Amino acid sequence: MLIRELLPELDDEQFQQLVSDVSDVSLLDRLDTTSDSPPVGRPSAPVPSALGPTAEPAMFYTLFAWLFESEYKRVVQAVRASHYVDKEHFPNIVGGLLDEFTVRLANFYIRPLVAHIKKVSSEGLLQGDTPEERYIDYCRRWPKDFMDGFYTSYPLLRRVHSIIVHQFHAIVAELFERIQAQESGIRELLGAQNAEPLTLESLTMAGDYHNGGRTGCLLVFSQGTVAYKPRSVDGERAFYRIVQKLAEQGAPRMRAARVVQGEDYGFMEFIEREDVDFTAEKFLESSGQLSALFYALLGKDMHEENLIPTSEGAVPIDLETILHCSHLLNDGKADIPDNSALLHKERGICTSALLPTRLVRKDPSKGYVDIGFIRGEQGANPFKGTVIEQPFRDDAIVRSVRYSDLGGPQQGTDPDTHTLEKRRATEVARARGFVRGFEQMYRWVCEHRDAMQELVRSECAALTLRAVLQPTMQYEQLVRMLGSPEALSSKSVFATVALRTAAFDDDRSLELVLAEVESLWQLDIPFFKHRADRTAIMTPDGQEVGLGIKTSALEETLNHISHMDEDDLDEQLNQIWSAFISPYPANTLADEPADIRQGRGGEREERELSTAIADRLAATVHSGTAPEDPWTWVSPVPSSQQHHHGIWNTDVLQTDLYGGSVGIALALAQAAHVLGHQEYAETAHRVFDPLAETILSGEKSLKLPEYIRDMAFAGEPGIAFTLAGGARYLGDTRLKDAALELGNQVAARIAKVEHPTPGYLSGHVGAATLLLGHELATDRQAPLAVLDRHAQDIIAGRIDDAWWAQSGFATGMSSSIFALSRWSQDMPSPERARQAVATLLNRLDELDNGEYWQMRVPIGESAHDGTWCHGSAGVALALAAVHCWLPELSNRASLDRAVRRSLQEGTKRNFTSCHGALGTLDVLEWVVSHVPDVSNAEAVHDAVKNGYNVSLLRETLNDKSVRYSLTPSLMVGTSGVLSWLTRRAGDTRLYTPIVPDSAEAH
């Protein structure tokens, strides 16, 4: 019986279908807890008396040694039967194997033992006055008094024990047999052709367990070292031959490891890791060349464990995932369009793991771990491992803790601006070296395309390679869950945990899920393979899993090579640059704002630049994963809650306003309106029309995660904003209808929230503000009620302290000051709105240091002073609203100072809307239109009309060391520049999400 609560990702219909499918194939009958699980042997000797922290290297170590004694003897016999271990090295070989065997069993025994000792102790069955004494008593008496009860409590553990024992003895015997079968080849790898016997000095197993517990192994002979791989080494052999033949044809030289090939296994020469400077230009250039070759061969999984740094360059040692199959087909399921953004991303260099590759959890502020070969600055690892707290006691605790809390690198405080600039300079230099090598090899492939394709055909046609269908990390998590006391005590839990693979993706084939479950029940990481010239995905024993490749990996790779060109190269370079430099933004357009607030240039040049940006956006759009999905882009993805440690990972852009597809579509709609290019309108419609169809049909939702659904910039309010803008610029009333329908849905939901969350970007208050400011809901009373409850919370002090410490507009108080002032007279209680604004203004005064308002931004530094999101421009917007709608509370001197500060500091940083010059100018344009006599009004008009010439913008957009040039984001990227330029060229009304007010100034 499956447990519903363990599969929360599935809806009720999906869960019932899974239950039915499992029943139809009698899957649970295969999980027998008794028939194939003989009782664990009970040694006759007592448990040794040496127990406790001074006698044992780990908790229960002595108990394990006693329990597994008979199995240890079998390992000794297997080693003794080998022809390759002499008397001198016998203890070392046996010791290494026994350690590995113990670890495999302990992975499943340790947590149940900790739980059981606690249970036995709570029942008063242990003797001793201290927790340490009771632990010793438990271990000594375990065979006689507690062993039977232990296995009764955890019946699945007998099965697990039997599997591990059977697997381990089989793979040890198999290893020695394979050494003997390939001895001549191993001698060739070692250069040991004399008659001296091969003598094995040490043996170290390492890696994940696949296909019956098999794992890689490092074999140190007296003649040298080789690596054993218990799977096909076709990929390694083909890569070696390709590298040799490319060098003969004049390609950049690379080093590859030699292999000896057996049937579904092989041995590889050992590549010694060298101490290499990862900032050295020569090393980076050679790594870039290797990366371009991997890109051509669709090579993946090239992370730090799979390449070895040497003075000659990086040497790959794990090549089972070249010719990676991206275009997979589920039996009976709809095909993904060839032009889909998903497939385009999967083939990109960003997925190779050779670049800095930072993995984060759902909350990026918790840190990251960089697994890339060319790693960047390392952070606090947010992922968790298992530790035993209070070991050698009866009250020991098994706890999951972050790896960073186990002594790994700590995030600490964010570095100062000077340190960030130094790191930025280092990363820019590293990126340039890497890019230089990547461009060289990429262009060499393009210039010798026919020869490259012929080489791939001749060397790769019959390869057997690995098909990576799911990240190994996800499978590893399930294996750990199978070792929990809960899983080992219940067949239902054990079965359901393995069946969580059904929730990994939508529409997974039943055959695939069953194959994964069978592997997991054997305690293996599921492993799948494919032949390069065929379309089937198979298990290690050749069973097809209801999943195929559309054309074969070979044809997919050849087709990929045929489409390599300068436009594609530019996209890959964006991905490379972002991987290196995105955590280190360039925030200086000019030292003095006066240098860029003049010399606008001609309108023709502006239109040419706008056309160039829009052409690029229209050319790089891709279809969704289904014909009815909105079209989108693949690019580095900026975060609306950016932290220094957060890299802009390349991905398929979602339908969000901040950095996603709908913001880009809005900019293209504006460009179509001003420039008159039909192609831009068609591209915008490709994004907007499917969304409008979904909204107006009422049959489906937009499938946004619930936690972001009502966020102004990441959720449905932002989509409604862009649809309304699209309606305005494209003349399409259907888009307006969809915007209002979606806005009404948002309004109805947030109206039910008793204590709305503050913050413009992501709070309920921000959603209400955007809906009101741009008339996105017909029921205005709903968002007004949200503002009223927000006012009540402010007056009562019911809002989190962190919010009170932020003065800015994006996440702080300024947006609330703006909204409560702007709509104070429309709210249920104008006086309450006034009182709340007065409270916020008093708090804002406390953050005023006389020069600017302390921002207290999440990243802990004042990088955005003067701009909209966290700086003076946002404060100016708020104070201008107070001046217009609650004049009795206005502080004109503060407003004037905020405008001056914004003009001085906020117009010289970068070209973004969120925290750069263009957003600052939009804000100041709104302010001076509503407060015409504000300080520096003429300078603002002059900057908007005459500043930011085309050559400056073009130079910045062409500079790939500036992260904002790498993304088409509306808020922090190239489509934001397009929007600003076309609005200025067309002299159209201000329509921007950073100013939540579309009404004309009074």
Model-identified regions with their sequence ranges:
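Long, well-ordered core segments of solenoidal/helical folds
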Residues: 612-629, 682-702, 734-754, 785-803, ...
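Solvent-exposed loop and edge beta-strand segments that line ligand/cofactor-binding
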Residues: 643-661, 700-716, 751-764, 799-814, ...
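Low-complexity, Ser/Thr/Pro/Gly-enriched N-terminal "stalk/linker" regions
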Residues: 578-654, 659, 670, 674, ...
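Conserved ATP-binding subdomain of kinase catalytic cores across diverse folds
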Residues: 75-82, 86, 90-299, 304, ...
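CBM-like carbohydrate-recognition segments
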Residues: 912-915, 927-1002
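C-terminal catalytic region of ATP-dependent kinase domains
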Residues: 1-135, 139-176, 313-611
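Well-ordered alpha-helical scaffold segments within catalytic/enzyme domains
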Residues: 355, 594-600, 662-677, 718-732, ...
